[in-house]
Amino acid sequence: MTRDFDVIVIGGGHAGCEAASAAARAGARTALITHKLATIGEMSCNPAIGGLGKGHLVREVDALDGLMGRVADQAGIQFRLLNRRKGPAVRGPRAQADRKLYRAAMQEAILNHRNLEVIEGGVSDLIVEDGHVAGVIAEDGRQFRARRVVLTTGTFLRGVIHLGTQRIPAGRVGEAPALGLSDRLYGLGFQLGRLKTGTPPRLAGDSIDWSSLEVQPGDDPPVPFSFLTTEITTPQVPCHITRTTAEGHRIIEDNLHVSPVYSGQIEGVGPRYCPSIEDKVVRFRERDSHQIFLEPEGLDDDTIYPNGISTALPEEVQLAFLKTIPGLENVVMRRAGYAIEYDYIDPRELRPTLETKRLGGLYLAGQINGTTGYEEAAAQGLIAGLNAALAERGAEPFILDRAQAYMGVMVDDLITRGVSEPYRMFTSRAEYRLTLRADNADQRLTAAGIGAGVVGERRVMAYEAKARALEAARVLCDGLRLSPTELARRGLKVNQDGVARTAMDLLAYPDIDAGVLAGVWPELAALEPHIAEQMGIEAQYAGYLDRQDADIKAFRRDEGLRLPAEIDYASVLGLSHEVRQKLAKARPATLGQAARVDGVTPAALTTLMIHVKQKRSA
């Protein structure tokens, strides 16, 4: 049996759900093929969404009418805005999520999605015709045809679970790995590597002595992810904090020989910024304790996720170590932690649309590209799914650059620099983070999403209403003006320099907000809280943003010089052999991308720019 679609998405995880939804929203007849319908939207590791850098990605996915932010708002049982004491540019929204509620909400969205058909089954092979993907073959022999296929295989490509000395072929606990696809991709010439990630043991909440632990409450009121969410209605619960001990570290040290991470059993490289507890103990021997966050997995499930102690030690060693932790002296371990090793493809094989250079019509998103994290996967899924749909109807691709979005930063990092370890997003990766804030993701991206046809009517209306409210607030704040003397009479002390100040000028002062100014100008009290907050942020950053805008214009000049796709770097006189090799492998699309290839010097860029301009004028 053969069936035809415009876009086929393989995998029902975070990348796959966003890819399928984006393609369907953009008008493509879309199929999502996944091993089990019941595991669509599964949170395979930690029960949380967002964080520093990651929360920015969730807001950007939401600004483009993606699913993750709205689903997290429905499932969130504790919300916290991280870095609240720092500037708005580096604040990151984060939420603990009830696993069951998250999965149920995502399945509700996917299974009832317009233009989207969900098909249960594994995929064993790609159909390739004349150097272009033409569909997929299911494990049971069914064929599904499409000229655009998005692979979002997560940790399933030749996945192997490691627990002590045990090696268990699996893509996730209890689920078989994808073997045929790995072989097929290798046969097509893709460069595959191995990475690994890990997860901590799961604990029985009723076996923990909560009275001895530090409580970590959420924000009140909670700050939602989605620009469409007006209120969080799910009950909120606290997390708790404890620490490892020197005794526990000794147990780990004594058993490193049976840790697959240190015995040589695992070949893949793990995430630098989410190390196992074995790695922490070995790399930071001077520390006698490490912080652990005890995170609830659900409202009606007392399973606890101990964030910070990912491990693949044997089960009996894990339990012995756990019992040395304050509050866990009598803990019951419901499931042991483990490491999982899997194949990924060098992301330098990709175009900015996340289509592979090697095989037309094939798009990759998520951990198959060497990233780690739900949020990174979701963002890539949206980009890949949307571009697959746009390509199918012959429309312009949807490409975000480093000055537009964290999504643009991530994709650019992946396709120009590649990965040597699992890639995760941080605010420090973005050069223009004053502009790329979580609070303004809709202002930055929703209009572009509307232009690409991926944004629904409800969000269009909300976006336009907010844009009107922001513009009205700017006009109001710029129009309210008083002299220093008049301000002093009203209790606001500013320099008596004779220069009148507007409400917008005053909002730049660290101790003045719209609430304070409402005592001077009562009309400001009518501003909605999120609009008033936006005015304060814009005022606070005004001078800095002017300077950053100049930097962005310079960046765009470099990005504007496109490099010919057929350029022969061996013929560019003045480039070193090393630089020629690196540029030939990366195939950057612009001079700006070439600048971000490791090892390419400013002198090499000048040489390359002169060469390209001479060729064009010849």
Curated annotation (Swiss-Prot):
UniProt cofactor(s): FAD
Q: What's the domain of life for this entry?
A: Bacteria
Q: Which SUPFAM superfamilies match?
A: FAD/NAD(P)-binding domain
Keywords on this record?
Cytoplasm, FAD, Flavoprotein, NAD, tRNA processing
One MF annotation (Gene Ontology) recorded for this entry? flavin adenine dinucleotide binding
Q: Which HAMAP family match?
A: MnmG_GidA
Name of the molecule in the record: tRNA uridine 5-carboxymethylaminomethyl modification enzyme MnmG
Lineage of the species this protein comes from = Bacteria, Pseudomonadati, Pseudomonadota, Alphaproteobacteria, Hyphomicrobiales
